[in-house]
Curated annotation (Swiss-Prot):
Tissue specificity field: Expressed almost exclusively in the brain. Abundantly expressed in the ventrolateral region of caudate putamen, the habenular nucleus, the zona incerta, and the medial mammillary nucleus.
TM region positions: 22-42, 58-78, 95-115, 141-161, 174-194, 221-241, 261-281
Regions of this protein lying in the Extracellular compartment: 1-21, 79-94, 162-173, 242-260
PROSITE patterns: G_PROTEIN_RECEP_F1_2
Gene: Gpr139
Cellular localization per UniProt: Cell membrane
The organism of origin for this protein: Mus musculus
Keyword terms: Cell membrane, G-protein coupled receptor, Glycoprotein, Membrane, Receptor, Transducer, Transmembrane, Transmembrane helix
Function: Orphan receptor. Seems to act through a G(q/11)-mediated pathway.
Pfam families: 7tm_1
Family to which this protein belongs: Belongs to the G-protein coupled receptor 1 family.
Protein's recorded name: Probable G-protein coupled receptor 139
CDD domains in alphabetical order: 7tmA_GPR139
GO cellular component terms, semicolon-separated: plasma membrane
Length: 345
């Protein structure tokens, strides 16, 4: 993320928001970090209990959000800009910047396979458990993490476009456009297309009730996450492109305020997912309350009952109960590697 405070620290009047950024980012870190850690704990229990692909993706998303809060909110904004009030040496600073881009790209792109997973679950339910299963999900998550890190290496040369003496180059334009495409335009296009298909499918079959708790709740969580992401990240993308192609900076103070607000909104996305899950999912809300109660009372949580094998029944969610006897149910159990094994009914 761009540095706008360190080079303005010598002139306190240059920071139009005063102490608002440091208070905001401190609050965001103190709120978001425990919330995401609690999310990881709860989703880890759900993954062990139910072996659902969607829980694995949400778990990976929470882990990526923790990395974003650490590298960007703590190291970049709080430690460097407000505590040290000076920029780090060039090489360590650039390495941290690569890790920042890697974490934010991972946080965004881990939602893409989750969207694809929900699309298959809703639109192709009979194929869902042969396409999406725990072993494959873990491979997809690992691939996203590795790919996002490797593709973030070129951001070692990311320019600070907000300095007054910045000189634009063609390489900088390429990096900025790649950033805008990879963190916003491409993911939002995928979210919009697949979510539109899912909504169309749900509306077309609105006279039937969804079978299964997780399909409806997870899909609602997906819609909420992607909608909030598109809304909160839009100001940052607009600011970057406007500054790159708009008029030269005439009022650095105003630009500084606008960029601060844009970054605040974008990073808010990493701290609120826990509260969205609690609002939408009763199961998640109940487990969160139980975990917090056990934590504050320093007691172990009750031992949950786990079966030796995880079973799931795959059928179309649009089949009415009256005609369900005409449909052959496909029952899958997972082996020790998380791959589905079809069992004859």
């Amino acid at each position: 993320m761009e540095h706008t405070h360190a080079h303005l620290a010598a002139n306190s009047s240059a920071c139009g928001l005063g102490f608002v950024p440091v208070v905001y980012y401190s609050f965001l870190l103190c709120l978001g970090l425990p919330a995401n850690i609690l999310t990881v704990i709860i989703l880890s229990q759900l993954v062990a209990r139910r072996q659902k692909s969607s829980y694995n993706y949400l778990l990976a998303l929470a882990a990526a959000d923790i990395l974003v809060l650490f590298f960007i909110v703590f190291v970049d904004f709080l430690l460097e800009d407000f505590i040290l009030t000076m920029q780090m040496p060039l090489i360590p600073d650039k390495i941290i910047e690569v890790l920042e881009f890697s974490s934010i790209h991972t946080s965004i792109w881990i939602t893409v396979p989750l969207t694809v997973d929900r699309y298959i679950a809703v639109c192709h339910p009979l194929k869902y458990h042969t396409v999406s299963y725990p072993a494959r999900t873990r491979k997809v998550i690992l691939s996203v993490y590795i790919t996002c890190f490797l593709t973030s290496i070129p951001y070692y040369w990311w320019p600070n476009i907000w300095t007054e003496d910045y000189i634009s180059t063609s390489m900088h334009h390429v990096l900025v456009w790649i950033h805008c495409f990879t963190v916003y335009l491409v993911p939002c296009s995928i979210f919009f297309i697949l979510n539109s298909i899912i909504v169309y499918k749900l509306r077309r079959k609105s006279n039937f009730r969804l079978r299964g708790y997780s399909t409806g709740k997870t899909t609602a969580i997906l819609f909420t996450i992607t909608s909030i992401f598109a809304t909160l990240w839009a100001p940052r993308i607009i600011m970057i492109l406007y500054h790159l192609y708009g008029a030269p900076i005439q009022n650095p103070w105003l630009v500084h305020i606008m960029l601060d607000v844009a970054n605040m909104l974008a990073l808010l996305n990493t701290a609120i997912n826990f509260f969205l899950y609690c609002f939408i999912s009763k199961r998640f809300r109940t487990m969160a309350a139980a975990t917090l109660k056990a934590l504050f009372k320093c007691q172990k949580q009750p031992v949950q009952f786990y079966t030796n094998h995880n079973f799931s029944i795959t059928s179309s969610p649009w089949i009415s109960p009256a005609n369900s006897h005409c449909i052959k149910m496909l029952v899958y159990q997972y082996d020790k590697h998380g791959k589905p094994i079809k069992v004859s009914p």
